[in-house]
Amino acid sequence: MPIKILMPALSPTMREGNLARWLKKEGDKVNPGEVIAEIETDKATMEVESVDEGILAKIIIPQNSQNVPVNSLIAVLSEEGEDKADIDSFIAQNNSVSLSLKTDATLKKSNDSITNVEGIKHDSNKIFASPLAKRLAKIGDIRLENVQGSGPHGRIVKQDILSYDSSTSSNKIVYRDTEEYRSVPNNNIRKIIAKRLLESKQTVPHFYLSIECNVDKLLDVREDINKSFSEDKVTKISVNDFIILAVAKALQEVPNANASWSEDAIRYYNNVDISVAVAIENGIVTPIVKDANKKNIIELSREMKTLIKKAKDNKLTPIEFQGGGFTISNLGMYGIKNFNAIINTPQSCIMGVGASTKRAIVKNDQIIIATIMDVTLSADHRVIDGAVSAEFLASFKRFIENPVLMLI
């Protein structure tokens, strides 16, 4: 009897995903536990393993398909020598989702046709324009009915469009040929990022606090630790590792900053789980260092390296990037001095970390050169007030400027 292969739900909140690639083709033998496809979720590309043994009789949803609903039929397994008519009958009975999608597409096509007919009906006064004039008008977003034609019988020509463009400086348009850019379809990750960031800026009352941190002691301690592990290529502590640990220790001291908003109540988290923004090819992902306050700098560094590699390879599992109570975004390696990051909802805080640069400062009434790092906290004012945010930043500064406090 044929066996259904359904679109899996790779996380509790997943409703649809992209079927990125089939690793098996129709007619191939499939064994239990064998990877047969790759599914693209909102944060990573996940492998789909077969539960049963059989022949991949039919691929219903082709690769590179977007917005495939969870639990929809994507393929069918059959036993060796199973009758094709039985397989076709099985697909017809179980492929209601595909039929529904086709019906929706048909309705959309019909509606588009109706819209086009209505558009033609209202266009009672035909406008005469040369093909080049029409092309220039389209590129420059100029309505032809607003242009006075100078050609035979009022025909709009190239010069009319160019004259219209230069006649009013406030409406001056720079023409760009459509061949000067390339269009890249938005993948599922990009769409989710866009949706969440827009929602965050529109619904969360952001406010920002900045502070300068002297990281000279931290750089010295980091150098000493790395020298002691010079033979161990895996253990190489980064500045970002210290930043993660300092945030974790500060959240432990100021637990009111480790919170999120819900309509019924503010949730204060018992665990200190830190999300760290990692740039990947298709956007950004935030793997989580769980219980970061309970880890030493070596453990934290090794775990972070593993998470970054998995993120770059699109191999993160949902449990490794869903959740978290606080996010760190570090753009210092790009020379960015400071920036205001957008809160990663439903979290209430994100800290933007800038570059460490040599600056002149006053210490004991003397001007000295120090390595200064700017950090900016973006906070949700529904959850965290200014005093709590300031207390958190003061605690972070104390740990980052005195790294020994994090190591004891």
Curated annotation (Swiss-Prot):
Domain named Peripheral subunit-binding (PSBD): residues: 128-165
Q: Which residues carry this modification: N6-lipoyllysine?
A: K43
Recorded GO CC terms: pyruvate dehydrogenase complex
Ranges where the Lipoyl-binding domain occurs: 2-78
Which NCBIfam families does the entry link to? Answer: PDHac_trf_mito
Catalytic activity, as annotated: N(6)-[(R)-dihydrolipoyl]-L-lysyl-[protein] + acetyl-CoA = N(6)-[(R)-S(8)-acetyldihydrolipoyl]-L-lysyl-[protein] + CoA
Cofactors (names): (R)-lipoate
List, alphabetically, the PANTHER family matched.
DIHYDROLIPOAMIDE ACETYL/SUCCINYL-TRANSFERASE-RELATED, DIHYDROLIPOYLLYSINE-RESIDUE ACETYLTRANSFERASE COMPONENT OF PYRUVATE DEHYDROGENASE COMPLEX, MITOCHONDRIAL-RELATED
Output the Gene3D superfamilies linked to this UniProt entry.
2.40.50.100, Chloramphenicol acetyltransferase-like domain, E3-binding domain
Q: Which GO terms describe its molecular function?
A: dihydrolipoyllysine-residue acetyltransferase activity
* Cofactor remark: Binds 1 lipoyl cofactor covalently.
Keyword presence, Acyltransferase? yes
The record's function comment reads: The pyruvate dehydrogenase complex catalyzes the overall conversion of pyruvate to acetyl-CoA and CO(2). It contains multiple copies of three enzymatic components: pyruvate dehydrogenase (E1), dihydrolipoamide acetyltransferase (E2) and lipoamide dehydrogenase (E3).
Superkingdom to which the source organism belongs: Bacteria
Q: Which family does it belong to?
A: Belongs to the 2-oxoacid dehydrogenase family.
Check the record and name the InterPro entries matching this protein: 2-oxoA_DH_lipoyl-BS, 2-oxoacid_DH_actylTfrase, Biotin_lipoyl, CAT-like_dom_sf, E2/Pdx1, E3-bd_dom_sf, LAT1, PSBD
Q: By which gene is this protein encoded?
A: pdhC
Q: How does it assemble?
A: Forms a 24-polypeptide structural core with octahedral symmetry.
Example of a GO biological process term: pyruvate decarboxylation to acetyl-CoA
Q: Which residue positions are annotated as catalytic?
A: H381
Stated name of the protein: Dihydrolipoyllysine-residue acetyltransferase component of pyruvate dehydrogenase complex
Q: Which UniProt keywords apply?
A: Acyltransferase, Lipoyl, Transferase
Enzyme Commission number:
2.3.1.12
